[in-house]
């Protein structure tokens, strides 16, 4: 029987025609794509595969950009605070920043947004007390000695960040690509004409792959190699700023955004902190612009009979695939690069026709983490196996229509075991897809809600890949949930107050005090506490992790302490008597103590998170001191979610924590996965309670 092909996208490369076509056959590719810096030859284009063509709409226009340097993208930057030792202080604006990435914008409109701050007093310095010396690149400030000062200014971005990263990583010697700002009408006119001509010139293209739209996630590089990365945040809107957008915002919203609204005392506004009204207004404003102008570009693509897919990374800011109006863009598909299971769920949950995941490792000499991949010291096959283990468990829970690779195909030469393993993965993926095609997988009756400040808008993600957000308990929880047999929904605090919570059996709140994930000042709302307290009393489970519901200025640190049966002492109760067991649990998390006599300490093993339980009415509060995703903790979480149930007798629960099962009733097929590097004999019970057994090699997938 001929091997099934399809649902796989391969990166092609001129000069590597033989390799491209050979691997397309082995991996079952039905689509070929280009990558940044590569082209597809006629031989590849005529090979019978559909063609994805990658465009980054805001770069690759250097001829136009050089003639219109005032139409480049911008951002606010702020100098590091500097201490005045005399009554005058000189601050060199670009001293802290990578001069190949930024240039000062001192146009009259841009200059009107500049600010100087006395950070010692927290006061804005009057404009009469400072001046800009263009010829020296310095701001001269009349100061109070021994106070610290910083300067906030608009800067042009003169090297598009993803191109900059690819350039440095791959040791390119090419012209630096400048990002153009589409907010200007002149840029819009140019880009619409360019898109029209591009479609005419690329008759062989079936799918235009937008990478992505207009604004990259913020990525500020510094002047010192030892601290090159000054700030990066995958979901931040810092790079959407321009003098034109600021002026238009003021006209539409009736108030002006200032430099300090973005700089925020030098802390900037990380996604991990709750968003205030100004930030949410700005996000809404930029999203509306992206939707309007992006829709015009997509209409042109459709006019030429091509499909439009968008990459859910890089210049994705303003796209907001989980916004209610995302479908109005008109995209035919979405593509997400994935390291982890939560990113599969993130991709699959977007309302569009086609979902495609881009597997890792990318075909780059060095991976995103900085370690060698397709170069000396790298082991791309082992990398692929470990990534696939995380991705696979989520793929068995939700459908994704396509899979593929990115990068430079010639790099796989010399790695035949990687080529073999990708052939195995592509076959596995198609098998899993067909099971979803026949019907949904079996799911536990427990529905889980994840409660935080962003709610649905940041479903499954926090702000970037796992290796960028690992410090947060919630990303570990999301990763664990991504492959478990539970329906999961993300909601914000307003929704928790205004919708029927009875659809949930469990609500999870996890994060550091003051973070967006814990909730910050949202917990000062008595209505929120009323709704959640009532819901737990009537039978719900509130599962708090880290510092859930934590806020200062109230009678308890954890506002749900009455439900959880534990609270956190920040020093106010250090002289108060406490229930037995408080001293023991405070060794695991300093300051933690029992608020109720009947709070049970269920698990206090050094290698696992502390777990406490407290009955409240018909429901209960469960507290975990922390959560790190691993097979043991994932099993623990699963058990906690199905309280009052003999977990080990439930269907499709394996006797080995390193293995997992997914059952597809319509096909009457079970997927058994070995998530470890060792051979396993795995047992589980089917729906009839009968025991089944499978012998699995390391990392193996078995479908039967």
Model regions and ranges:
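Catalytic domains of carbohydrate-active enzymes, especially glycoside hydrolases
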Residues: 4-54, 194-209, 390-400, 480, ...
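The substrate-binding groove and active-site-proximal loops of carbohydrate-active enzymes
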Residues: 6-12, 28-35, 169-189, 274-291, ...
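Structural motif
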Residues: 33, 209, 335, 505-515, ...
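Hydrophobic targeting/anchoring helices
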Residues: 44, 61-65, 196, 206-212, ...
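A short helix->loop->beta-strand "cap" motif at the edges of active sites that frequently abuts
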Residues: 49, 305-306, 353, 538-541, ...
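Polysaccharide-binding and catalytic clefts of secreted carbohydrate-active enzymes
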Residues: 70-329, 346
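A conserved amphipathic helix/loop scaffold
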Residues: 383-384, 515-704
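Short helix-loop-beta junction
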Residues: 467-490
């Amino acid at each position: 029987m001929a091997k099934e092909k399809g649902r796989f996208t391969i990166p092609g490369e001129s000069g590597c025609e033989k390799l491209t076509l050979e691997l397309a056959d082995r991996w079952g590719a039905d689509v070929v794509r280009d990558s940044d810096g590569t082209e597809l030859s006629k031989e590849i284009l005529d090979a019978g595969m559909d063609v994805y063509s990658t465009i980054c709409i805001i770069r690759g226009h250097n001829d136009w950009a050089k003639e219109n340097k005032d139409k480049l993208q911008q951002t606010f930057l702020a100098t590091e605070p500097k201490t005045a030792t005399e009554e005058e202080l000189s601050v060199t604006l670009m001293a802290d920043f990578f001069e190949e990435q930024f240039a000062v914008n001192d146009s009259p409109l841009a200059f009107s947004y500049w600010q100087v701050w006395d950070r010692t007093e927290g006061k804005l310095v009057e404009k009469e007390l400072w001046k800009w010396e263009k010829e020296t690149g310095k701001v001269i400030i009349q100061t109070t000695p021994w106070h610290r000062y910083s300067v906030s200014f608009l800067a042009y971005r003169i090297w598009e960040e993803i191109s900059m990263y690819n350039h440095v990583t791959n040791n390119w010697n090419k012209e630096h690509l400048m990002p153009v700002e589409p907010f200007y009408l002149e840029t819009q006119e140019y880009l619409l004409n360019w898109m029209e001509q591009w479609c005419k010139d690329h008759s062989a293209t079936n799918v235009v792959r937008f990478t992505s739209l207009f604004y990259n996630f913020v990525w500020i590089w510094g002047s010192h190699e030892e601290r090159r990365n000054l700030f990066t945040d995958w979901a931040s809107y810092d790079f959407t700023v321009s003098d034109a957008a600021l002026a238009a915002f003021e006209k539409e919203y009736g108030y002006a955004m200032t430099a300090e609204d973005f700089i925020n005392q030098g802390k900037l506004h990380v996604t991990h902190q709750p968003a205030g009204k100004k930030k949410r207004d700005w996000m809404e404003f930029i999203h509306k612009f992206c939707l309007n102008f992006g829709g015009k570009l997509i209409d042109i693509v459709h006019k030429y009979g091509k499909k439009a897919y968008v990459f859910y990374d890089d210049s994705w800011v303003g796209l907001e695939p989980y916004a209610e109006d995302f479908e109005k863009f008109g995209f035919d598909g979405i593509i997400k690069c994935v390291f982890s299971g939560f990113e599969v769920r993130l991709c699959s949950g977007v309302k569009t026709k086609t979902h495609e995941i881009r597997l890792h490792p990318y075909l780059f000499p060095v991976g995103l983490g900085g370690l060698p991949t397709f170069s000396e010291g790298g082991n791309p096959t082992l990398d692929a196996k470990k990534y696939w283990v995380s991705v696979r468990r989520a793929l068995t829970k939700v459908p994704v229509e396509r899979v593929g690779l990115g990068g430079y195909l010639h790099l796989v030469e010399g790695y035949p075991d990687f080529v073999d393993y990708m052939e195995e993965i592509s076959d596995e993926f198609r098998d899993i897809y067909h099971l979803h095609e026949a019907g949904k997988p079996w799911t536990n009756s427990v529905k889980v809600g994840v409660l935080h400040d962003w709610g649905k808008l940041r479903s499954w993600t926090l702000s970037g890949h796992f290796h960028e957000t690992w410090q947060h308990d919630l990303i570990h929880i999301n990763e664990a949930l991504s492959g478990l047999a539970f329906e999961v929904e993300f909601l914000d605090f307003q929704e928790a107050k205004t919708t029927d919570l009875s659809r949930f059996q469990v609500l999870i709140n996890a994060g550091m005090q003051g973070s967006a994930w814990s909730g910050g000042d949202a917990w000062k709302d008595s209505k929120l506490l009323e709704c959640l307290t009532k819901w737990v009393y009537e039978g719900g489970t509130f599962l708090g992790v880290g510092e859930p519901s934590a806020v200062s200025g109230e009678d308890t640190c954890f506002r749900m302490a009455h439900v959880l049966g534990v609270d956190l002492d920040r020093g106010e109760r250090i002289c108060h008597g406490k229930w037995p067991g408080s001293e023991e649990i405070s060794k695991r998390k300093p300051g933690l103590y029992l608020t109720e006599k009947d709070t049970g300490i269920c698990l206090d093993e050094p290698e696992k998170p502390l777990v406490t339980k407290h009955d409240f009415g018909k429901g209960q509060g469960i507290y975990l001191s922390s959560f790190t995703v691993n097979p043991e903790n994932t099993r623990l979480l699963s058990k906690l979610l199905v309280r009052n149930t003999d977990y080990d007798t439930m269907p499709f629960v394996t006797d080995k924590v390193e293995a997992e099962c997914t059952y597809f009733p319509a096909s009457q097929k079970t997927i058994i996965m070995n998530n470890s590097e060792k051979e396993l004999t795995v047992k589980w019970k089917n729906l009839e309670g009968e025991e089944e057994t499978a012998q699995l090699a390391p990392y193996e997938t078995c479908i039967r």
